[in-house]
Amino acid sequence: MAKSDYYEILGVSRDAEEREIKKAYKRQAMKFHPDRNRGNAEAEAKFKEIKEAYEVLTDAQKRAAYDQYGHAAFEQGGMGGGGASGADFSDIFGDVFGDIFGGGRRQRVSRGADLRYNMELSLEEAVRGVTREIRIPTLEECDVCHGSGAKPGTSAVTCPTCHGQGQVQMRQGFFAIQQTCPTCQGQGKIIKDPCTKCHGHGRVEKSKTLSVKIPAGVDTGDRIRLSGEGEVGEHGAAAGDLYVQVQVCKHPIFEREENNLYCEVPINFAMAALGGEIEVPTLDGRVKLKVPAETQTGKLFRMRGKGVKSVRGGSQGDLLCRVVVETPVKLNERQKQLLRELEESFGGPSGDQNSPRSKSFLDGVKKFFDDLTR
């Protein structure tokens, strides 16, 4: 069966620079890597093609030979154990591929996966801090084989294919290319008698309960990292981390903007005109707020230090109260008559002295129409 063109495999032009080839390789490798396509033979074969194409096209000597002779330049190949002769491409794989999948030179042991837990908090809990118990599903070390994957009384043995190196060498013409051992998958060892509980994986599915301390001042989008509380690694490798993602629920009174809190405070029009004192809510309880005479809707009153303390310590935000002047409703006849008398005392709906904003607005409207008729 004819082999595919290396340039077509990576999806690059024949005059592509090495930087473009590396970028294309990364993209393709992530898509078809065996760790992401377990049990998919077609993806595994595709990945081998991608890897082979990358190895040739990023080596100047190999690429020149391929451009001139095609695949014929690398015929007459064979496979052997990992040795010292020939070109060693492990460093290239480490640079380009290791950062993505954690691959390494020689034996490969995978660190445990990180876990994420979404936690909803009330505004009060986020502001003051709280300790919560959470239960999470995870992978933990098998208590029968203690993570080895082997049946008690036995142990893993050196891989007969790679002799414990985790890699084998493929010879193609006068070149030698190293790749992950297909027998042990890079581990360097194989398990002949697997543990009956974990079936050779060294890990089992469990749930665990953790106590999580949430610091005061957190907000939506913040993450708390619990080191080593993720899934345990394969065959004794380091465990991953647990990330607690914070989501603060909407509050019926307060809105938060960074470390400041905002709330709307309704007052009647008499207090707005004459001034007075009202009680406003804070997260620490009720406090008195003095409202000066002639206060308008939208006026902001700042109460310093009544907001949220910074999660990093030090500064504390403020509470900003926005006044909303309410129009009275369901008036009786006596109240309506009093309002009519009040309006008359103003000299009409747009009394110059008592309603400066109304007068300014009406003057502007008059000027607008005067300009239109000129």
Curated annotation (Swiss-Prot):
Zn(2+) 2 binds at residues 159, 162, 181, 184. GO terms for molecular function: ATP binding; heat shock protein binding; unfolded protein binding; zinc ion binding. A zinc finger (CR-type) spans 129-207. It comes from the Bacteria. Its cofactor is Zn(2+). It is found in: Cytoplasm. SUPFAM superfamilies: Chaperone J-domain (SSF46565), DnaJ/Hsp40 cysteine-rich domain (SSF57938), HSP40/DnaJ peptide-binding domain (SSF49493). Homodimer. This is Chaperone protein DnaJ. It comes from Sodalis glossinidius (strain morsitans). The gene is dnaJ.
